[in-house]
Amino acid sequence: MKHDFSLPGADRQEAPVATLSTLFDHAVAAAPDKVALRRLDAVLTYRELGRAVEALARRLARLVEPGDVVALLLPNSLEFPIAYFAALKALAIPALLNPQYPAAQLAPLLREATARAVICAPATRDMVTGLAGDLGIPSVVCLGDDVMVPELVAEAGAALGLRAATPSDSAALLFSGGTTGLPKIVEHTHGRLATGVHCIEHAWPMRGEGEVFLPIAPFTHIYGFATGVLVPLSVRGEIVIPERFQPELVVELLVRHRVTFFGGGPPAIYAGLLAARNLGSADLSALRMCPAGGAPFPVELMERWRHATGLEIYEGYGMSEMAPISAATAQSGVRPGSVGKPIPGGDVQVVDLETGLRVLPPGEKGELRVRGPHMMTGYRNRPEETAQTIRDGFIYTGDIGHVDGDGFVFITERKKDVVFVGGFNVFPREVEELIHTHRSVAMAGVVGVPDARTGGERLVAFVVPRTGETFDPTEISRYCAGRLVSYKCPSEVRVVEQLPITAAHKLDHVALRRAARGEQELSTG
């Protein structure tokens, strides 16, 4: 099924709204009676959403000062966008934290962010209250318990009377992996996030108010936050929020609400839907945009999705530091294995691994560095790590890849994931891609572990069979041996029921490495 991307608004080139607060206000004013959010039986129009945000902002303004950090510890819900935009209205800085984290993992993040208030859900209230007491955080607001959404919608009150936010004000704190073990805080301003929204709207063209979004990725993750909250509200679309990720339920929602933009994200989500019993009979005629991001996407899985639904998967490449994409397909066209071309206003270069300064010609592999008007201001309170990552105006991504002669970007591997086997560099993704082409394989993950025999490393492959399929590990070993040079073949293949997935729905290579070393158990078939 092919779609025309020459749509109203697809060629919009006007400057983005200067702040996210004004972006939100424009949406509320332009489409007050249109449905903004939908979850289960609860529905909020843009007018009701605007009222709820104003009411919560008034309460927050009594608890925090402008510039204070307010931590959002919320699942994907009606409450998340209310809390986020209310914090902005109160001139606070929202810090987006994964609500699935245990207390021991949250405590250092809240401390690092210097949070002065936490907004949470009833499920985590007791834990958050205890943490707040231990850390000296003055305020905890529990949405859905202390404060109910209908109560906020019905509340009347005077305007806040605070100054308007500026493009240079901080608008979000996100968390990215740190070299010391503690995640770094990625800081973005209103202006840079608003520019990022504009970039996404151009990369994956929108139809405006006719768009119906179904996001899967967590709103606390940059991909889910941008494509599931900011972009839909910017174009005054409708956001259908699933209660949970259950493949049959998601397919049902896609059909019932005539979803046009499915923010699937990582490969694990699409693999899950392909296994859904009701996918084959689903009417997906309204669906036109299926973007992917957050993890390398196997070409074979894209082909299976296209065969099952008639729809293309449009990849994007980005990270928390780039809010969130630097390259994307759709307008640039789909090229197998590529994440597309750099977005307008952005730049993607491939540089040598030794110095990071020499720009390589098309076809040569090296480290990708990116820049654009939507890149982070830096890592909060981490000047040294900021200087290591941002050099000469570019963010050094740590990703290995190349650009072809037509300008399409290809990602080969994370720099840190390259495995050294028998004196050769091996890219696990290449091996994963091959294993995915086996007719009986649903998912595969490949990692490197120390090899006591050689003193180097060896490859271990974890493979999940498709529903109803069984095979012996030696079958995969033979399959690889007939198609790869010997040092790229896994020395061990393990058949498992499922692969470990992170909270952002990415394949968890850290857990796979632990399992390969015998430090963690995975369910076997």
What are these regions (language model features)?
Residues V259-G265, L274-R335, D347:
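Gly/Ser/Thr-rich phosphate-binding loop
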Residues L40, R59-R62, K89-L152, L160-R163, ...:
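Structural core segment of the AMP-binding/adenylate-forming
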Residues K341-G345, G356-Q388, F424-V426:
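Conserved ATP/PPi-binding loop(s) of AMP-dependent carboxylate-activating enzymes
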Residues A194-V212, T220-F261, A276:
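Conserved AMP-binding/adenylation subdomain of ANL enzymes
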